[in-house]
Curated annotation (Swiss-Prot):
Organism from which the protein derives: Bacillus subtilis (strain 168)
Gene: yuzD
Assigned keywords, A-Z: Disulfide bond, Redox-active center
InterPro entries associated with the record: DUF1462 (IPR009190), Thioredoxin-like_sf (IPR036249), YuzD-like_sp (IPR038218)
Annotated protein name in UniProt: Putative disulfide oxidoreductase YuzD
Keyword Disulfide bond: yes
SUPFAM superfamilies: Thioredoxin-like
Disulfide bonds: 16-19
Top-level taxonomic group: Bacteria
Coiled coil region boundaries: none
Amino acid sequence: MMKPVMLSVYGAENVCASCVNMPTAKDTYEWLEAALKRKYPNQPFEMQYIDIHEPPDNEHAKELAEKIRNDEYFYPLVLVEDKIVGEGNPKLKDVYEEMEKHGYTENR
């Protein structure tokens, strides 16, 4: 059994200024979770939502949250393990490709 990968979605309650008419970060989190469970059933993964205004007590998370607040990245920012796979309007295809690099296989 492979180790479940960690997907992180960074964001805030409000939609980013450059992302008007896009889903919120929490909506993106829920959408990603549902899509991944359908694509990779019985293949566990972990997900975490990180509020950029109240990141956990973890240097990496604090650093990324600060970069987002400083407009170095758009949010929602999506990571698979520690690799950024999407920002602003993440593409499922990019998330799937990274998941498959970690051994996940499509439900057929």
